[in-house]
Every structure is written in structure tokens, then in C-alpha cells.
A protein has these predicted regions:
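Terminal, non-globular segments
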Residues: 1-170
């Protein structure tokens, strides 16, 4: 099945809304001094409904959008989100059919892993300020924020993808 224009426009609308919320609202509501990464959580949740190449594509496009406002090297977030989307889509067949609790825990675990991956990529390219922070605390805050975010965003993702698995290029 190919992704129709309706699904594409719905997905773009959701990502644009989450992006605007991320840059305008979320920085004012920090958990333990850290900002929650809503676009990452949405990439992981959406990738549960895609095959691995398409999950990587969605992650890349969302990451490029986020890279426009971050003070990290351009493409670092896109790379991290691409890998998160690919990895999430790879385990999607075991998780998509499960209940919301299992899905929330999976999104929390994968989001925390992607946060650690972001710090690892930063260390590889020599960004000390990314790895100096308390990585465990940042990953924990991301995981904790992913639990209610998944419950709130799941109906929107189901609205975008009425079928269980959608493949953009078949």
C-alpha cells in the first residue's frame, strides 16, 4: 500500500503542530531542568506503523526540521532521528498490535535510547557539551515524558494511519 495524499497531509500537519509546540511551549515546562523532545517521541511513535526505510525517512525529515532551530551541527538530529525511526520500525511487528501500555513503554525505551544515541554521535564528532550533561537524567526525563505523550498522541497517529502498517514505497 502506498501512502496517499490524505495520510501525508495529516502527518505533515501533526509534525508541524508538534514542532511549533516544541519551540514555543515546551521550553517553559521543563522536567528537572531538561526540555522534553516531543518530535523524537512522535518519530518513534509514527515509526511503529512504518517499514524500516520509511521510518528512517520520516525520522530524517523531522530531524532536519528540528536541526533548523538547534545549536548543534546541522544534520546531527536528522541522523539520530533517522536511526531511531529505522530501529523503531524494525521492532514494530512485535509492538504495534499490543495494548497502549506496551506501546508506551516501548516508545519510552526507544526514545531514551535515541537520546543516548544523540549524545554518542555528539561525542564522536567532538561536541563536549553534549556529553558533559547528565546523560542518564536526560534519558530518564525523555522516557518519563514519553509515557503520557504516547497515550495522548496515539489517537492522532491512528487517525493518520487507519491501517496497521503503511508503506510509502511498495
Amino acid at each position: 500500500m502506498t501512502l496517499a495524499g490524505r495520510e501525508t497531509s495529516r502527518l505533515v500537519a501533526i509534525f508541524a503542530t508538534i514542532f511549533l509546540i516544541q519551540i514555543a511551549v515546551v521550553p517553559h515546562f521543563q522536567l528537572s531542568g531538561y526540555v522534553v523532545d516531543l518530535p523524537l517521541i512522535l518519530v518513534v511513535l509514527v515509526s511503529l506503523h512504518l517499514n524500516p526505510p520509511n521510518g528512517a525517512l520520516v525520522g530524517f525529515l523531522a530531524g532536519v526540521l528540528v536541526d533548523l532551530v538547534l545549536h548543534t551541527p546541522f544534520g546531527m538530529t536528522a541522523l539520530t532521528f533517522s536511526l531511531a525511526g529505522y530501529g523503531t520500525s524494525s521492532v514494530a511487528s512485535q509492538v504495534t498490535e499490543r495494548n497502549i501500555i506496551v506501546r508506551s513503554l516501548t516508545v519510552a525505551l526507544l526514545s531514551a535510547t535515541a537520546t543516548a544515541l544523540f549524545a554518542g554521535i555528539g561525542a564522536l564528532i567532538g561536541l563536549e557539551y553534549v556529553t558533559r550533561r547528565e546523560l542518564g537524567a536526560i534519558a530518564l526525563v525523555t522516557a518519563i515524558a514519553a509515557l503520557p505523550s504516547t497515550v495522548l498522541l496515539s489517537p492522532l497517529v491512528r487517525w493518520v494511519f487507519p491501517l496497521e502498517t503503511v508503506q510509502i514505497n511498495e
